[in-house]
Amino acid sequence: MNSQIFAYLKRKQLTDTRTVNRLFVSSFVSLSDLKIENNHIIKGLLIDKDDKDFDLLQEFISKIRHFHPTPMTIEDMISLFEFVVSPADRIVTGAVYTPRSVRKKIIETCLNTMPNEQMQHVRVADIACGCGGFLMDVALFLRNNTGRTFCDIYQESIYGIDVQEYSVERTKILLSLLALLYNEDLDFDFNILQADTLDFNTAEWNQTYTHFDVIVGNPPYVCSRNVDAIIKEKMLQYEVCLSGHPDLYIPFFQIATEMLNDGGKLGFITMNSFIRSVNGRAVRNYFSRGIHDISILDFRGYQIFQKKSTYTCLFFLTKNQASDTLHYAVNENGDLNVTPKYTNILYDQLDNKKGWSLNDFDAVRQMESTGIPIGKYCQSRHGIATLSNKTYIFKPVAEDDNYYYLESKDGRYPIEKAICRNVINSNKLNSEVSFESIIEKLIFPYCINEGRATIIEESVMKTIFPYTYTYLLSQRKQLATRDKGKTDKYPTWYAYGRTQSLIMPRYKLLFPKFANKPLHCVLKDDADLMLYNGVAFVSDDLEKLQVLKSVLDSDLFWSYLVKNAKPYSTGYYSLSGVDIKNFCIPTIKKRNVP
């Protein structure tokens, strides 16, 4: 339903927050047959028969009935409110709808063992509350387990913080509607604060919003490249952000921990990248001191958030409950009804710098401690970076003694063979194709002198490679768009965007960046063979690469990838440096020949 409703609002150009709120609330009240006498938040949003938007409301209700023939629930409202957050805001704020099953699991884990007496005055917070889904479920849990009224729970027990005004408003709306469904028609005193949680460590922070017994939620995931400069500056005030380029969710670990009372519990669904990434190194240092009791339920390649390429885990912490072990379990099918089987892993056996290899810990630890790590055994190279592969890389449609022929939308161009090299995309090695079938041609406007690659001068290009020069001129406008138009520092307009991997050692062991089955690496003896989009181990020592090939093609290495590498929902595993660099190559002793 959500996508159809969003398309309808877009088609009607209904972008004003208040108008959208009024439509959603009025529709829900009408479809639920609610009678409101006292709640002024909801009454103030209702569209009556005399309202100019009444016809729009009737049309909107008919759309809902069409798209959603079953009765509309409060969960539908949460989902709708989260869904209509603009795509631009999602990039900046990391707002996303958290499925109810996940919210319920986190809340029950944090509250189920709490004595009823403590629940009577517990303080529970969501410090990045969005539209209030977690807070709504906390309120329901407390009401069902204590008999307290929503009025009392809202005033004394639940607290929300969000940077967006519309999120604060919608949280109050949803909590009001929840109470109305249970016949509590009142004006409520809410503890929902509009503020940037990153300001927690400032003197101006509202002290009502700290010293919590429980914190639950889904901290915002915003990739570091999309984090505003001002926000980055705030993040650097937190110890957990002092490595790599941390994403926005990272500081919420430290903030939530510091906001808790001693013995307080934290339950997050969050990205699992902190377990192994450089960006998570400072977080690992922070938690490995053994001050708190920590459990991680890792979903690995299972995607909890539909249509989102995000990989997550459940993270639980009890503050100042010392433990020298981390509790880790894997759940790769998303079934939250299954009791996790946690493995206890000693912190002093973990390497915070290189990342935590937690899955099947003992087996992986053995593979990472016997021999020479791949990262030290052999140099790896990524491919060239032209920043316009479609200009430089082609499959000839014909050839003769002197030229390859390149077909483009502008016509057919002869390209001098002398300026071309063979190039491959080694990612294609994971498919059932022959090596020869994936060879392409690369226009290589460089000459190699004394181990250095230098661009061929334009005057030489015109004279020696006139046909290639003519073709490149036809692409000049396209080439000028590289690096967002900032190409003035290129040695010439037809130079590649980057100079990486222009010179490679003679021997190359080629393999894909992602694989869904055991590898079959290709070892090539060709100093001029170039690479794009994939990865290769390179060396002038053929025997070294032969040994490495036998290891990478082995079932043992594949089992290591399955246990340790970053998984994807499509069944693929990553072969990036961070995923494989710690796997050890066995030391092979040469026998003495008598």
Residues covered by each model-derived region:
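Hydrophobic alpha-helix feature that most strongly marks membrane-spanning transmembrane helices
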Residues: V85, L111, P115, R143, ...
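Short, well-ordered loop/turn elements at secondary-structure boundaries
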Residues: M119-H121, I153-S157, D187-D189, Q194, ...
